[in-house]
């Protein structure tokens, strides 16, 4: 009896793009010596406002990447974009020693972000954004800080409700 080891993909998984953020070789010291394995961090997105991150661990990089992609697909979140090109409002978030500042930008600015933050915005579908990493630039903590920022962002409807205005007044600023 053979077992199919291929990852299962759903119909919507075909239009997802994935980027490898980091690969780390970790070791566990056992009685016979060191046992090496790999830890992989991947971001996955549909380039239309949905993005997810996942981490996979395995003895081989390819298997770790498959695990990471599956984990990323499971925890995808929706990010509200203005005109499908930038963030609706500026946001700051912190995770461990990493702090990220994400700012919306004018048309033609591009993705001004360093390291692992750029990968998130590329798979998210953002064209104009400015991002700054303050503190630790460890890829894992920076990615989790960015996702914390995305989760704290408000939709235009929520912003309009807080301000007591119409959604069209909030969007057309």
UniProtKB/Swiss-Prot annotation:
One family name in Pfam for this protein: Ribosomal_S5_C
Family: Belongs to the universal ribosomal protein uS5 family.
Domains as described in the record: The N-terminal domain interacts with the head of the 30S subunit; the C-terminal domain interacts with the body and contacts protein S4. The interaction surface between S4 and S5 is involved in control of translational fidelity.
Example GO BP: translation
GO cellular component, one term: small ribosomal subunit
Originating organism: Anaplasma phagocytophilum (strain HZ)
SUPFAM superfamilies according to UniProt: dsRNA-binding domain-like, Ribosomal protein S5 domain 2-like
Primary role: With S4 and S12 plays an important role in translational accuracy. Located at the back of the 30S subunit body where it stabilizes the conformation of the head with respect to the body.
Organism placement in taxonomy: Bacteria, Pseudomonadati, Pseudomonadota, Alphaproteobacteria, Rickettsiales
Keyword check for Isomerase: no
Protein name from the UniProt record: Small ribosomal subunit protein uS5
rRNA-binding among keywords: yes
Residue ranges of domain S5 DRBM in the record: 16-79
Quaternary data: Part of the 30S ribosomal subunit. Contacts proteins S4 and S8.
GO molecular-function terms, A-Z: rRNA binding; structural constituent of ribosome
Xref: InterPro entries: Ribosomal_Su5_D2-typ_SF, Ribosomal_uS5, Ribosomal_uS5_bac-type, Ribosomal_uS5_C, Ribosomal_uS5_N, Ribsml_uS5_D2-typ_fold_subgr
């Amino acid at each position: 009896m053979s077992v199919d080891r291929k990852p299962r993909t759903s119909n919507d998984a075909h239009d997802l793009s994935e980027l490898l953020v980091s690969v780390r070789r970790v070791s566990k010291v056992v009685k016979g010596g060191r046992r090496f394995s790999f830890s992989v961090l991947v971001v996955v997105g549909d380039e239309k406002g949905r993005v997810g991150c996942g981490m996979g661990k395995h003895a081989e990089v390819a298997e770790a990447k498959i695990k990471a992609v599956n984990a990323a697909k499971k925890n995808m979140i929706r990010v509200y974009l203005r005109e499908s090109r930038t963030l609706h409002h500026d946001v700051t978030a912190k995770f461990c020693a990493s702090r990220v500042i994400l700012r919306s930008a004018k048309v033609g600015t591009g993705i001004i972000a360093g390291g692992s933050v750029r990968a998130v915005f590329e798979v998210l579908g953002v064209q104009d954004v400015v991002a700054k990493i303050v503190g630790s630039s460890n890829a894992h903590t920076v990615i989790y800080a960015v996702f914390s920022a995305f989760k704290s962002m408000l939709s235009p409807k929520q912003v309009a409700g807080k301000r007591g205005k119409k959604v069209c007044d909030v969007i057309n600023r």
